[in-house]
Structures are given as structure tokens and as C-alpha cells.
């Protein structure tokens, strides 16, 4: 099998590599809000996949949380792909996604258990916005019954260590 050269989308993923500090807010199902602080360590697995590990606490609680995010690009399907797991829940989340025309925003979509009723499934989108070489945002939204999107989590990332050149 011939090696597949990395695509521009694989190159885009590399800007997420590094050590990050994170501050965020989350709106709970009861309407209350919680703040959180965390760290993320992200590296490439070969030329194709990002492996990121977030460690912090559940917003508004003193409960440790660890999450693992994998992001890649599937050239055959012509879309971004990924998975997410987190210690607060037993579900493996599978993403598909696309990059904005201006190359600043990656939108990952998935179906996952509803925030309020775990027996139901809801549509979600997680949005990564590159704001500079050393900052980015991550927003999570759930699709409501009327088709609109409700943002329930926003996180702000600051690079705490420059990644090595790729």
C-alpha cells in the first residue's frame, strides 16, 4: 500500500498541538452556570490524527474529569472525523465535521445522549474557532426541538507551551 500524503486539512489539525490552559463556563440543565479550569495536552499521532487529553473538574463541582479527543480527516469521505470520551459518561461519541471557508472554524457534529433525558438522543455540534496562533475557543451546542441551536458550554484555550515545528 502506498502512503497517502497528508492533506491541507491534516495540516490544519496540527495547529491544535501543544499544551493549553482552559477556562470555561457551562450552563446546567437547571439553568445554573458553572465555571471550570482545565489543561489540555495535544499531540499528533503520525501525520493524520490529533490526540488531545483534557484534565480538569466538572463545571460547578469539585469532581475530577478527564476527556480524550481524537480528530482526523478522512480524504475518501472528504470530511473531518473524530471521537470523544469523557470520564463523566459511558458513551463513545463519534464526530463528522467540516472546516469553514475562511479556515478558522471546525464544526464537529454528532448524536449523543440528551442532556436532560439520557434515554433520548440529541444532535450536538462542537465548534473549534482558531482566534490566533496561541488562542482558540471551543463551544458545545445542542439542537432544540424547534431546530435552533443552544450553546451550553464555552471554553477559551491559551497556549502554555509552543509546539515543536512540524
What are these regions (language model features)?
Residues 1-166:
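Hydrophobic small-molecule pocket/channel-lining residues, especially in calycin-type beta-barrels
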Amino acid at each position: 500500500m502506498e502512503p497517502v500524503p497528508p492533506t491541507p486539512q491534516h495540516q490544519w489539525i496540527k495547529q491544535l498541538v501543544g499544551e493549553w490552559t482552559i477556562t470555561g463556563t457551562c450552563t446546567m440543565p437547571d439553568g445554573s452556570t458553572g465555571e471550570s479550569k482545565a489543561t489540555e495536552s495535544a499531540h499528533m499521532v503520525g501525520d493524520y490524527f490529533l490526540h488531545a487529553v483534557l484534565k480538569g473538574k466538572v463545571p460547578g463541582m469539585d469532581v475530577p474529569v478527564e476527556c480524550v479527543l481524537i480528530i482526523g480527516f478522512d480524504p475518501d469521505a472528504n470530511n473531518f472525523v473524530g471521537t470523544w470520551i469523557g470520564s463523566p459518561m459511558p458513551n463513545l461519541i463519534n464526530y463528522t465535521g467540516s472546516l469553514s471557508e475562511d479556515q478558522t472554524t471546525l464544526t464537529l457534529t454528532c448524536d449523543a445522549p440528551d442532556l436532560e433525558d439520557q434515554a433520548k438522543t440529541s444532535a450536538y455540534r462542537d465548534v473549534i474557532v482558531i482566534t490566533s496562533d496561541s488562542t482558540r475557543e471551543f463551544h458545545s451546542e445542542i439542537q432544540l426541538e424547534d431546530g435552533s441551536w443552544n450553546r451550553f458550554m464555552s471554553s477559551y484555550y491559551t497556549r502554555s507551551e509552543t509546539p515543536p515545528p512540524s
